[in-house]
Amino acid sequence: KNFNPEKEAETFLKEVFLSMGLIVKIKTEQKDKHLYIDLTGDDMGILIGKRGQTLDALQYLVNLVVNKKSPYYISVMLDTENYRQRRKETLESLAFNLAKKVKHTKRNVVLEPMNPYERRIIHSALQNDRFVTTYSEGEEPYRNVVITLK
């Protein structure tokens, strides 16, 4: 049977947006086993939600829908208004500032709970720092990153 992940994702998202009363333009692009979906329209803040939680939830659901019928695993990345890149920059900046604080106060800093993707951004941002190290603790979905002196 002809399986088209882009079409599956689009059909699902159109139904969701229709139910929400939102008019959203959906642009999909598939590269290998990755499906990138960019959403444009008014009120995209509603789709982003607090710290991207709504966008993450929607991405999770699209992932389930696409992979239900896919013969191989497809990674789905949902974005709007360049939110993912902006969030990455915010998290990197936060990581650098908190690392400074740890060096100055010599006390650990525990960040708010984050999803694995966001925790990875923090770990990557500080991996080459000679004075601090990072690790994750806690149980999903409430795992947080701890920044500590080496």
Spell out what each predicted region is.
Residues 1-150:
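RNA-contacting regions in translation and RNA-metabolism proteins
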